[in-house]
Regions:
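Structural detector for helix-capping/boundary residues
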Residues: 16, 38, 52, 65, ...
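A short coil-to-beta-strand element that immediately follows conserved catalytic motifs
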Residues: 61-69
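Nudix hydrolase/Nudix homology domain
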Residues: 31, 99-136
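Active-site-adjacent beta-strand/loop module that shapes the phosphate/pyrophosphate-binding cleft
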Residues: 71-94
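Conserved N-terminal beta-strand and adjoining loop/helix that marks the start
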Residues: 1-19, 70, 87-89
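Short loop segments at secondary-structure junctions
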Residues: 15-17, 24, 89-94, 109-111
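A generic structural micro-feature
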Residues: 2-4, 32, 76-82, 101
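Conserved Nudix-box catalytic region and its N-terminal flanking loop in Nudix hydrolases
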Residues: 14-56
């Protein structure tokens, strides 16, 4: 049976840095760096789901959410992901990671390019994300 999954992520800014979190062995992609977010639950409001995922993964509350872009990828013959990527701001840089992640960094532009995987960087390039972010 085919499956469609909606994932929401947010580029979270604090003091002109972007929060990256590193996956633990909890799920596939161990050691990959990513921006916070996750799946939307059935019946959940988009921003409520985004806030829930960010709180669960980082302990942060965010504000000023702006939808930056949407993407889709067929990850297997029976599974398609639709991704929404937002821009948000944090009031604090104090991160409390869940068991899904093992490390974090408030990344500069250089670190962002070095740490993120190619598909995410390709999405960022396609949507000119690095050009619109006010980061060091």
């Amino acid at each position: 049976m085919a499956e469609l999954w909606l994932a929401q992520k947010s580029i979270i800014l604090y003091n002109r840095k972007v929060l990256l979190i590193q996956r633990s062995n909890y799920a596939s992609g161990e050691n990959d760096w990513e921006i916070p977010g996750g799946g939307l639950r059935f019946g959940e409001d988009l921003l409520e789901g985004l806030h829930r995922e960010i709180r669960e993964e980082t302990g942060l509350s965010v504000y000023g959410e702006k939808l930056l872009y949407a993407m889709t990828a067929l990850v297997s013959p029976q599974r398609q992901i639709v991704g929404l990527t937002y821009l948000s701001y944090a009031d604090s840089d104090e991160v409390t990671l869940s068991h899904e992640h093992k490390d974090y960094v408030w990344a500069s532009r250089k670190q962002l390019v070095e740490l993120l995987n190619k598909p995410m960087l390709d999405d960022f390039e396609k949507h000119s994300i690095l050009d619109i972010l006010d980061i060091d």
